[in-house]
């Protein structure tokens, strides 16, 4: 077989995600850089996106390595783990698929929940208001949470230590930093209205408040 079943599931999920998210991403891209408050800061605007794309490339290599179609230098254990009980490895891979499903729901649902306030850059758009509908009822930055979850899930599905490390220790901090920057803009603009919203969610930026721990 060309791919293990979990890898085919990742491909299918990614394909569906591209199709479903294209309309909202196109609108968000068209609004980029048009905000009433916008800071052209590489660490805020571009670094999270570029590192996420780099991680996707690493996941791609790891997936092909996991399925024995590539053999890059240091393939094991850097790009994928291939030693151990095959059934256990596949079970872990399926766990990654489940995490990826959750991530895609949060990511795409977060973009749609923002509606006309969604831009692919961190900025405050003209006429923007504090929103608490859709997935914004559960977490302050559902799309960023979803991006991180999706990359973690795809990394686990590929049994990729390098991709998982990038997701947790590089991608996640960059998106969290961007989330905090956006909060500063929203607090400056909306004051107590936004603070009240954040307090209602226990200031949970990435992990819904119904989980006992989180950020």
Regions found by a protein language model. Name each.
Residues 1-132, 151-215:
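Membrane-anchoring alpha-helices and their flanking helix-loop junctions
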């Amino acid at each position: 077989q060309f791919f293990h079943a979990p890898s085919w599931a990742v491909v299918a999920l990614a394909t569906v995600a591209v199709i479903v998210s294209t309309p909202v991403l196109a609108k968000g891209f068209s609004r980029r850089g048009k905000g009433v408050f916008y800071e052209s800061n590489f660490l805020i605007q571009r670094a999270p996106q570029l590192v996420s794309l780099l991680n996707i490339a690493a996941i791609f290599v790891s997936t092909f390595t996991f399925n024995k179609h590539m053999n890059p230098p240091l393939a094991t254990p850097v790009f994928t783990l291939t030693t151990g009980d095959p059934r256990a490895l596949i079970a872990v891979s399926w766990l990654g698929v489940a995490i990826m499903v959750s991530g895609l729901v949060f990511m795409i649902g977060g973009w749609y929940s923002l509606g006309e306030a969604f831009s692919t850059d961190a900025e405050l758009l003209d006429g923007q208001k504090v929103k608490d509908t859709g997935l914004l009822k559960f977490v302050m930055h559902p799309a960023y949470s979803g991006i991180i979850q999706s990359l973690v899930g795809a990394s686990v599905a590929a049994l990729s230590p390098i991709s998982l490390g990038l997701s947790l220790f590089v991608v996640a901090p960059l998106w969290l930093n961007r989330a905090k920057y956006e909060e500063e803009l929203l607090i400056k603009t909306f004051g107590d209205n936004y603070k009240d919203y954040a307090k209602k969610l226990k200031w949970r930026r990435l992990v819904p408040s119904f989980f006992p721990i989180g950020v």
